[in-house]
């Protein structure tokens, strides 16, 4: 399994729309950087957020998620409360090749401020926006800047295409648009 370079990422994005919209250069002046890098792609966070709250007084249950646990917010700057959590989505839409797995890591700009980003791997054959999990581990409110970088995606190409892709197994988050809350198939 090999890590893919900027040349490969550019080719896949231009010829096969692997990343849309695709930014061919790394933009970093005056913003949290985003776009193509040497061996990855810095994704942007969109302007839609779901911020966790305890107003509803419910328990967070991934098998039976209560939407009262979150407050919707749309804007250029999202304030994540101290020791709290928010969901967001990428600006970019991904169409993953059937022999490629992507891993996403948080950006050091945010990590150095106590903001931790988690994203599960993008499986081969996955199509959709990526839901981003953002944790504010500090005792202070934290700013997240919409339409700027939030994490870096690394692309790993397997030795051969997988037997069953995410699309083949009709993954529960396939073709997701916007922020997708937890789902359990029944």
UniProtKB/Swiss-Prot annotation:
User: Which pathway does UniProt place it in?
Assistant: Pyrimidine metabolism; dUMP biosynthesis; dUMP from dCTP (dUTP route): step 1/2
Signal sequence residues: none
Q: List residues binding dCTP.
A: 107-112, 152, 166, 176
SUPFAM superfamilies referenced in this protein's UniProt entry, alphabetically: dUTPase-like
InterPro entries per the UniProt record, alphabetical: dCTP_deaminase, dUTPase-like_sf, dUTPase_trimeric
List the PANTHER family.
Answer: DCTP DEAMINASE
Q: Which family does the record claim for this protein? A: Belongs to the dCTP deaminase family.
Could you tell me what this protein is called? Answer: dCTP deaminase
Q: Which organism is it from?
A: Campylobacter fetus subsp. fetus (strain 82-40)
Q: Which gene codes for it? A: dcd
